[in-house]
Amino acid sequence: MSRSKRDNNFYSVEIGDSTFTVLKRYQNLKPIGSGAQGIVCAAYDAILERNVAIKKLSRPFQNQTHAKRAYRELVLMKCVNHKNIIGLLNVFTPQKSLEEFQDVYIVMELMDANLCQVIQMELDHERMSYLLYQMLCGIKHLHSAGIIHRDLKPSNIVVKSDCTLKILDFGLARTAGTSFMMTPYVVTRYYRAPEVILGMGYKENVDLWSVGCIMGEMVCHKILFPGRDYIDQWNKVIEQLGTPCPEFMKKLQPTVRTYVENRPKYAGYSFEKLFPDVLFPADSEHNKLKASQARDLLSKMLVIDASKRISVDEALQHPYINVWYDPSEAEAPPPKIPDKQLDEREHTIEEWKELIYKEVMDLEERTKNGVIRGQPSPLAQVQQ
């Protein structure tokens, strides 16, 4: 595309303290959220004749961590296509060359709210179990591609008014380190599993702890473990669930183990005490049964020792969830990730920038009428 023609395709609009320079097809931009990764606007796509969400990545080349995360997100969004993972519609940059390249805009399906808003509502068992079922389907699909999220939280899960749910991002790269001792809180970590905050090894069911925290918050309308830092969070976990057994302590790194073993010992509370009947809809025998099933599922997800925690497959077959089971959703074919070493890659910022630029150019080339060619369209799901 020539320089002048490219210039003519874009216009700029001020959104808070940021300038969005977007393709002219995207009109009526309105800010709907912001986070560590960038600012998100709702917009109207005049070509697709539908509302979309546009995310401007925040300083993608500020450092190697930002650049790696931007590259990982683009590669994975391009490959993953599942009804419970947010759909990629378009990617673009207003800059005209690698030398000028500094902004990345990602266009996605627009949803109605994130789970933070839904958590404040009184949900019946049908809605709660359906939301959890969809969460588990999305997580299982990521796991099938070798993607373990590790950072699920209400703010990165979105819903529509018809109760459909989608996961917004792909979590922490496998190489993203975490440190237990005095780690400052840069982002919300209330939903991260004990094995993450204690710097242990982890497997897929690390994400089931996060689902348990989210489900518990749906029931109680409050954050279960709102720690000020990792140490405070660990204390809140053991105060409620009890100090884990010596067998668990043996798995910890020596410095962490010394600290954890020297904490006061807690017996913890029963799940009947933590999640009493009064918190659930229980106005019929059916609802009383459902409350019992919900509590049982919570007790299997909120287990400190990951070796004793439920797996995503077991959760999908749990009586509280399996009423929704559909093989086309829960057993969808795994996405093909071309770069198997995605999380292990290390580059300079300039090398990351070039890799990201190539991805954006490739996606621009593959985009026709706003939908990425070479993968099933998320629009097909919207129109079903």
UniProtKB/Swiss-Prot annotation:
Its EC number is 2.7.11.24. GO terms for molecular function: ATP binding; JUN kinase activity; kinase activity; protein kinase activity; protein serine kinase activity; protein serine/threonine kinase activity; protein serine/threonine/tyrosine kinase activity. The modification Phosphoserine is found at S377. One of its GO terms (cellular component) is nucleus. ATP binds at I32, G33, S34, G35, A36, Q37, G38, I39, V40, K55. The modification Phosphotyrosine is found at Y185. It comes from the Eukaryota. It catalyses: L-seryl-[protein] + ATP = O-phospho-L-seryl-[protein] + ADP + H(+); L-threonyl-[protein] + ATP = O-phospho-L-threonyl-[protein] + ADP + H(+). It is found in: Cytoplasm; Nucleus; Synapse. Phosphorylated by TAOK2. Dually phosphorylated on Thr-183 and Tyr-185 by MAP2K7 and MAP2K4, which activates the enzyme. May be phosphorylated at Thr-183 and Tyr-185 by MAP3K1/MEKK1. Phosphorylated form is more concentrated at synapses than none-phosphorylated. Its cofactor is Mg(2+). Induction: In T-cells, following T-cell receptor (TCR) activation. Levels peak 48 hours after TCR and CD-28 costimulation. Its main location: cytoplasm. The TXY motif contains the threonine and tyrosine residues whose phosphorylation activates the MAP kinases. Binds to at least four scaffolding proteins, MAPK8IP1/JIP-1, MAPK8IP2/JIP-2, MAPK8IP3/JIP-3/JSAP1 and SPAG9/MAPK8IP4/JIP-4. These proteins also bind other components of the JNK signaling pathway. Forms a complex with MAPK8IP1 and ARHGEF28. Interacts with TP53 and WWOX. Interacts with JAMP. Interacts with NFATC4. Interacts with MECOM; regulates JNK signaling. Interacts with PIN1; this interaction mediates MAPK8 conformational changes leading to the binding of MAPK8 to its substrates. This is Mitogen-activated protein kinase 8. The gene is Mapk8.
